[in-house]
């Protein structure tokens, strides 16, 4: 007991998975947790370093990323300063919106299929591709995200929260800047499609939101 001086504790929310060696492992849902911490009036939130960029998307609250429990104890005892993680949300969001590894413009021919994909992309419709192996279904589907309308900042926040709760965000990731594109196989289970399970998780329908 008495490892930490209690006067600071009620001003901060702390989240993380503590390993036996004292290191902190990343968690799911850092973004919605940070939003709730701000709503509840916390001065700051302390999370594993891998979650810091994700949580720092939320403004008006200090976000600190730490490697281990020792850093947290020394911070609360005034022996170590922690540097808050700062993200220029708008700048980062718009800078990443137009970068795609695969481009729809690379596809030659297939005019009828391309037209169908363009209509689906513009109207936000679902689409199913049926054809013989090697006919270009996967190649076309992988390039569809490059013609989807850009996300708004509000849509990006909604989408990032869902993927955060599902544990789908990569470490050291901020806002999702491109529309999610999901291509489930026809053998997918009902739970995987709609969500649920013993430990409920968002399904493909939720992951495709926006």
What do the predicted segments below correspond to?
Residues 1-128, 132-138, 176:
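Peripheral, non-AAA+ core regions of ATP-driven protein-machinery
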Residues 3, 77-81, 122-126, 146-149, ...:
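Generic secondary-structure signature for well-ordered alpha-helical cores
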Residues 16, 65, 183-185, 195:
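Flexible glycine-/small-residue-rich
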Residues 118, 174-182, 190-210:
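Conserved alpha-helical scaffold flanking the Walker A/P-loop in AAA+ ATPase domains
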Residues 128-173:
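Walker A/P-loop
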């Amino acid at each position: 007991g008495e490892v930490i001086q209690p006067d600071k504790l009620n001003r901060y929310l702390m989240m993380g998975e503590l390993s036996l060696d004292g290191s902190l492992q990343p968690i799911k849902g850092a973004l919605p947790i940070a939003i709730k911490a701000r709503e509840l009036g916390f001065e700051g939130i302390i999370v594993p370093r891998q979650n810091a960029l994700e949580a720092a998307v939320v403004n008006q609250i200090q976000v600190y990323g730490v490697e281990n429990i020792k850093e947290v104890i020394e911070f609360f005892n005034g022996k170590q300063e922690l540097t808050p993680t700062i993200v220029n949300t708008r700048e980062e969001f718009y800078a990443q919106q137009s970068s795609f590894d695969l481009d729809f413009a690379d596809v030659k021919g297939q005019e009828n299929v391309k037209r169908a994909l363009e209509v689906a992309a513009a109207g936000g419709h679902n689409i199913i591709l049926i054809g013989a192996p090697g006919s270009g279904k996967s190649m076309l589907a992988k390039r569809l995200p490059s013609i989807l309308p850009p996300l708004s900042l509000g849509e990006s926040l909604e989408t990032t929260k869902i993927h955060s709760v599902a544990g789908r965000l990569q470490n050291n990731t901020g806002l999702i800047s491109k529309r999610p594109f999901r291509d489930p196989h026809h053998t997918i289970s009902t739970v995987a499609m709609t969500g649920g399970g013993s430990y409920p998780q968002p399904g493909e329908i939720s992951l495709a939101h926006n």
